[in-house]
Curated annotation (Swiss-Prot):
Protein name as annotated: Phosphoribosylformylglycinamidine cyclo-ligase
E.C. designation(s): 6.3.3.1
Entries under InterPro entries matching the protein: PurM-like_C_dom (IPR010918), PurM-like_C_sf (IPR036676), PurM-like_N (IPR016188), PurM-like_N_sf (IPR036921), PurM_cligase (IPR004733)
Biological or metabolic pathway of the protein: Purine metabolism; IMP biosynthesis via de novo pathway; 5-amino-1-(5-phospho-D-ribosyl)imidazole from N(2)-formyl-N(1)-(5-phospho-D-ribosyl)glycinamide: step 2/2
Source taxon at top rank: Bacteria
An example Gene Ontology biological process: 'de novo' IMP biosynthetic process
SUPFAM superfamilies listed in its UniProt record: PurM C-terminal domain-like, PurM N-terminal domain-like
Lineage: Bacteria, Bacillati, Bacillota, Bacilli, Lactobacillales
Amino acid sequence: MTEKNAYAQSGVDIEAGYEVVARIKKHVARTERLGVMGALGGFGGMFDLSQLDVKEPVLISGTDGVGTKLMLAIKYDKHNTIGQDCVAMCVNDIIAAGAEPLYFLDYIATGKNEPAKLEQVVAGVAEGCVQAGAGLIGGETAEMPGMYGKDDYDLAGFAVGVAEKSQIIDGSKVKEGDVLLGLASSGIHSNGYSLVRRVFADYTGEEELPELEGKKLKDVLLEPTRIYVKAALPLIKEELVNGIAHITGGGFIENVPRMFGDDLAAEIEEDKVPVLPIFKALEKYGEIKHDEMFEIFNMGIGLMLAVSPEKVDRVKEVLDEPVYELGRIVKKADASVVIK
């Protein structure tokens, strides 16, 4: 028995791994940007910071996955957008700290290496990197039979960005009277899917629920997470925002307070929130308490900004998209987030 045959008999297909690398090269090439060095396949990804026009660079990093949204991608056999979700979860976090994404690495673990499927996953990662302006400089694909079922895989990512030291957003600039502005989400994004899957466990995904305005359920559930880099970065460069909150798991209640100090609170007017149809459907079919929805989901707002009142008009001008004036920063009395 040769070593190759022995490894194959244990469930690891080395040739399939080589095929994946060959397939993804064209997708990785799309993400080339200033500072990226070296070719795909080295032991480490390289990035030349000296190419950047940053006087006092501070590196800011983030890592995340996409949770059980992956299980729906597997269920519906649609793998070409889940990679964008992974990138979004990482780069949206670091943009909230004031960082411009520089590069990204991905990690895929699977029970059986299927090159065509994994190419779709990486194509989605590459698309996310293009939207974020980040180079895809490395990654790992691990075939792990016995750990995962043959159709299963997991996906995680790691993003590194840079900020001018003076432009870091850490909550210290947010003050009473700041206006809370919201940018629309594209859908559920990548949080709350354990509940989503329970609510729609008996659905095929082909349903066109009346709340979903003619769209199939599976398409709405797998709508990729919006990447906010190109919207937020000009605001950061122009120093127009005091705080940024990426609305992920925990919804408004957990994430909004992360952008300001313990002595402040966010007062949000519920009727200003552009609640998406999918959240109305989840609340109805899942029989979820209305208040709890704001503790779980983004409800239609994926990024929230704290802005000085005199800068609001300029922020809206720079964004050139619908901007939702949601409320104000106030002195904290009891709760950190008050939804009226």
